[in-house]
């Protein structure tokens, strides 16, 4: 009879840990998800509070571009769903800000950095 009990016994739902505080999430996300890019990551520049970053990429052709990203914190439902499918899920993710289509390409990293430092977001959050 114990065989049938084990066979039809419902699994207890696993306990979902509480969402970590924002400061811990920011620390946890530092240098995460950089392997998702198809181009080579050359440099990562973080904002003063580490909640945003510019990712500088180099393509095989030798051209450079960059992408601005910010931390997106999952809400409670998203957090529960993520943990129900993956025990190693993070409570946040890096999300691209702005349109990835039509990004400028640069011949050198120096030229790219000069242009990047002129952006309003850079002046507001990175200096």
Regions found by a protein language model. Name each.
Residues 7, 71-72, 77-79, 103, ...:
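A structural signal for the main folded, soluble domain(s) of proteins
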Residues 78-111:
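A short, exposed loop/beta-hairpin motif centered on an aromatic-Gly-Thr core
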Residues 56-89:
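A short, structured beta-strand/loop element
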Residues 44-48, 59, 100:
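Compositionally biased, intrinsically disordered low-complexity segments
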Residues 3-52:
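Negatively charged, low-complexity tracts enriched in Asp/Glu with abundant Ser/Thr
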């Amino acid at each position: 009879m114990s065989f049938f009990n084990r066979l039809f016994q419902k699994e207890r739902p696993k306990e979902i840990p509480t969402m970590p505080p924002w400061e811990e999430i920011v620390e946890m996300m530092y240098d995460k998800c950089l392997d998702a890019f198809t181009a080579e990551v050359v440099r990562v520049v973080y904002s003063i509070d580490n909640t945003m970053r510019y990712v500088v990429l180099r393509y095989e052709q030798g051209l450079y571009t960059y992408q601005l990203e910010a931390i997106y914190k999952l809400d409670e439902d998203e957090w529960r769903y993520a943990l129900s499918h993956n025990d190693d899920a993070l409570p946040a993710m890096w999300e691209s800000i702005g349109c990835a289509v039509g990004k400028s390409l640069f011949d050198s990293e120096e030229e790219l950095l000069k242009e990047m430092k002129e952006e309003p977001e850079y002046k507001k959050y990175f200096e």
